Amino acid sequence: MATTISAVILAGGQAKRMAGLDKGLQLLQGKPLYQHCLQRLTNQVSSISINANRHQAIYQQSGVEVFGDELEDFQGPLSGILTALERANTDFVLFVPCDSPFLPLNLCEKLQSAVENSKSLLAYANDGEREHPAFSLLSTQLKLPLRVYLQSGHRQMLQFFRQHKAISVDFSLQKQAFVNMNTLQDIEKYQNIYA
């Protein structure tokens, strides 16, 4: 039976490095950052939703399902990941951050191949120099261990990933795909660069 995969754009953070502005809604080349992600995911998975804790009505204008973290107080990306895994009706969920408008068009394909070949429950991207755990594919079987991990007060993604024998997948030929917009200056820098 074929593995089923849905995708979630993680837009639930506080954006402290962007003066609290909602990162996913900042414009790059006339389009909100999250819409760049949505466009690049469309041909990779059958269904996409957005994890957002603010401005949900604006995100809903895109026509996709929007949901907030079940856990309160902005507990980091793992909180959004947990909520997504608990809501999912697919075998795996692909996660991407909302501030990465150039994400790889073959992200799902490569991560899926890695989990299938290794029989792992989890894979994430690296660019040959840095690990990028926010670009990850997780089995919904991890929802209970993740809930326990968060209830224990832990928040580090890579620590959880390593505990569950995550596969780090090499995207070193696509380094630029992992550029993210952490500040308004980052967005300004890339206004005239096209993916």
From Swiss-Prot:
The top of its lineage is:
Bacteria, Pseudomonadati, Pseudomonadota, Gammaproteobacteria, Pasteurellales
List of residues binding Mg(2+): 99
Compartments reported by the entry = Cytoplasm
Write down the species.
Answer: Histophilus somni (strain 2336) (Haemophilus somnus)
> Which GO molecular function, any one, fits this protein according to its record?
GTP binding
- Record's NCBIfam families? molyb_mobA
Cofactor(s) demanded: Mg(2+)
Entry's Gene3D superfamilies?
Spore Coat Polysaccharide Biosynthesis Protein SpsA, Chain A
Q: How does the record comment on the protein's domains? A: The N-terminal domain determines nucleotide recognition and specific binding, while the C-terminal domain determines the specific binding to the target protein.
The annotated subunit structure for this chain is: Monomer.
Q: Which InterPro entries match?
A: MobA-like_NTP_Trfase, Molybde_CF_guanTrfase, Nucleotide-diphossugar_trans
What Gene Ontology cellular-component terms does the record carry? cytoplasm
Query: Where is it mostly found?
Result: cytoplasm
Give the binding site residues for GTP: 10-12, 23, 51, 69, 99
Explain the purpose of this protein: Transfers a GMP moiety from GTP to Mo-molybdopterin (Mo-MPT) cofactor (Moco or molybdenum cofactor) to form Mo-molybdopterin guanine dinucleotide (Mo-MGD) cofactor.
Per the UniProt entry, the Enzyme Commission number(s) are 2.7.7.77
| Family that this chain belongs to | Belongs to the MobA family.
Asked whether the keyword Translocase is assigned, the reply is no
State the protein's name: Molybdenum cofactor guanylyltransferase
User: Which reaction equation describes what this protein catalyses?
Assistant: Mo-molybdopterin + GTP + H(+) = Mo-molybdopterin guanine dinucleotide + diphosphate
